[in-house]
Amino acid sequence: MLLENNQLIIVDIGASGGIDTRWKNLTSYFKCILFEPDPREYSILKENSDSNLIVLNSALSDSNKTVEFHLCQKQEVSSIFPPNFDLLNKFPDSERFKVQKNIRLNTDTLNNQLIKVGVNEVDFIKIDTQGYELPILQGSYDYLDSVIGLEIEVEFVEMYKGQPLFDEVDGFVKSKNFSLVDLKRYFWKRKGTGNTTNKKGQLIFGDALYFKTPEQILAISNINQEKIIRSIYIYLAYGYVDLSQVLLQEAKNINLLTEEVFTSLVKTLKKYEKNELGKSFRLRKKISNLLHKLSIIINLDEDYSFGTDQKIGN
């Protein structure tokens, strides 16, 4: 296996619910460092941890400081920023944002935390911290040069008071040589708007997927064969076979890959190309979209989020 002695290093910040299953589906050769400041969820993650995972009960920011963390009724929406009920009360189920308790946390930077656990390089970072993504990114600068991809929750309206919005986060990430490749959008409809089942509401937030392009990867200082291999697998984790193909060929053209590794990667990509062919029929996509719409119509509790994209990546 190409990753057997060259494991992926993944960081998951705001790790409620555990690591994305896409990584375990991709390979068993990875290490993931999970950060979860909410003591309720941290205990669950720690209990279910395995040898691939390092679970840390640390709050991250752009510096060392003390912050107030708002523990909400629904654990997943807890945030350092207070909920903005002037906005949230216009939409259904705002009660889940009700703050049950405030706790004070000492923050640290991702730079410092990764040094403490002996991680020198990272391949992928996912951040879902309810509006606090930008300060965390600003405290990660030592590692961003080596990172291939980012999945970041972004908001288009102020769900939390004082939070940075998409344009600020997007500007910072692009300044670090990442390109936006996909956006899973979440739409909400206003309360009490009657039968609007098949109509989208307002764009509220999303999950943004950023990659370094093949050209940007090849421009990384001290780029080597091992990093090329991991980069290709990062692309494949999200279904971007085309980016994998381009990176593979360009790396071969400048003699970054041995013939043995190149041949092995070609075989790997052929498997994914076959999978893509099986997914390419338009009828399958139409049926999938129809079933998604029917599920929302049947489950009226989810009606306010009609139009939300089903997934991120291919």
Language-model regions, residue ranges each:
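Phosphate/nucleotide-binding beta-alpha loop and adjacent structural elements of enzyme active sites
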Residues: M1-N314
